[in-house]
Amino acid sequence: MVACTSNDDIVKDNELPVITDAGITANPVDCQVYSRGETIPFRYRFTDNEELGNYNIEIHNNFDHHTHGTQKDNCKLDPKKDSKDYKKPWVYNQDFTIPRGDKAYDAKQDIQIPADIDTGDYHFVIRVTDQAGNQQLRSMPIKIK
């Protein structure tokens, strides 16, 4: 006797994880302004129907006024900068783990802004991935003076 299983019997998790500010004071928010040398206190809640995996925070310049399609507010932007005028644009990109088995997680990180970076418009990008590999992205425009 041989037992067979079918992949049709496996329920696949296709639901995206959620990046939310429900029940917390989220930070940063759209159009928030920071100064060089300050700390960005990152605070967001992640949830998933099955199990969270990890998250990533990326900060990069928006001197060319590009978009990621997730911004809600229209922030007042500085004039566009040509890449030849960049002296020291800031790029931050860090992965963080979420404890195994968690369906909800309050993420907290304090991110130091270097004192010598180019000022101007930046994007603060959050990516959260669940254990099935589904990913949600949220991008917020911020300004660094």
What is each residue range found by the language model?
Residues 2-3:
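C-terminal motif of bacterial Sec signal peptides marking the signal peptidase cleavage site
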Residues 6-7:
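Short, conserved catalytic or interaction motifs in soluble domains
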